[in-house]
Regions:
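Accessory DNA-engaging acidic/polar modules
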Residues: 1-109
């Protein structure tokens, strides 16, 4: 799947490590401030517990990151769960793939 250009894409956040993919040089400072470290083709950050995960989700929403859709506990599914239980109260954006290079970005207010 080809990641959207000039976007921050959260590909994993339900496990013990959050993963963000981006080609935006301007995103580096924000990700470093959140504790992310650059790997070869992505940014990674350990997640201590669910409180840490909730704070990280809120911070990534503030950075206008895209949360990837998918099966099981996709980043978008986790944000929706946090909205249902009242942890996330703001809007966010998600991305769904329709093909290897086709995607749809949706705003959830």
């Amino acid at each position: 799947m080809k990641a959207p250009v000039d976007e921050m894409l959260v590909t994993d956040i339900a496990g013990r490590v959050a993963v963000v993919v981006t080609d935006m040089m301007t995103a580096a400072d924000g990700l470093i401030r959140l504790g992310f470290a650059r790997q070869s083709d992505r940014w990674e950050r350990a997640i201590a517990d669910d409180n840490d995960r909730q704070a990280l989700v809120a911070a990534l929403i503030d950075l206008d990151a895209l949360f990837s859709t998918g099966r099981d506990w996709s980043p978008q599914a986790l944000v929706e769960y946090y909205r249902e239980i009242g942890v996330v109260r703001s809007g966010y954006r998600s991305v769904a793939w329709r093909g290897p290079a086709q995607y749809v970005i949706e705003r959830h207010d």
